[in-house]
From Swiss-Prot:
Family according to the record: Belongs to the universal ribosomal protein uS13 family.
Species in which this protein is naturally found: Chlamydomonas reinhardtii (Chlamydomonas smithii)
Pfam family for this entry, one: Ribosomal_S13
HAMAP family: Ribosomal_uS13
Function of the molecule: Located at the top of the head of the 40S subunit, it contacts several helices of the 18S rRNA.
Protein name: Small ribosomal subunit protein uS13
GO biological process assignments: translation
This protein's encoding gene: RPS18
Length: 153
């Protein structure tokens, strides 16, 4: 149960996975500040770690935070299903994993480079700076391109 008076051990800002997390928010919503962790995954992690969802992030003990970060680091060991993870069947390793913060950025960049290197349709669209997912581009998405006709004086 959340208390009205903050204890002496309350942390206003927590450092989790190289991200500053607001200690005043409830733990489930505070964890969503970390890239790669959404509300559903955060909720599941809190339940697996047996942490009270109504508790503020700054009120969590070091043991509770350690348990949650352990689950985020290795979710398959805690019986989180493969379809719930954000990296499924990795191209290099074939493994399923949950990527967070800097790992996510690195893997996304590598994926785009791989698509460009194999010269597939998606890779070429990324290379040219065009829409990738089949959207029409005749009239929309013109920002940042060449300027139109200049008016005569």
């Amino acid at each position: 149960m959340g208390s009205l008076v903050q204890g002496d051990d309350f942390q206003h800002i927590l450092r989790l996975l190289n991200t500053n997390v607001d200690g005043k928010n409830k733990i489930m919503y505070a964890m969503t500040a970390i890239r790669g962790i959404g509300r559903r995954f955060s909720n599941l992690v809190c339940k697996k770690a047996e942490v009270d969802l109504r508790k503020a992030a700054g009120e969590c003990s070091a043991d509770e935070l350690e348990r949650m970060m352990g689950i985020v680091a290795n979710p398959r060991a805690y019986k989180i299903p493969d379809w719930f993870l954000n990296r499924q069947k990795d191209h290099k390793t074939g493994r399923f994993s949950q990527l967070t913060s800097s790992q996510l950025d690195t893997v996304m960049r590598d994926d785009l480079e791989r698509l460009k290197k194999i010269r597939g349709h998606r890779g070429l669209r990324h290379y040219w700076g065009l829409r990738v997912r089949g959207q029409h581009t005749k009239t929309t998405g013109r920002a940042g391109k060449t300027v139109g006709v200049a008016k005569k004086k």
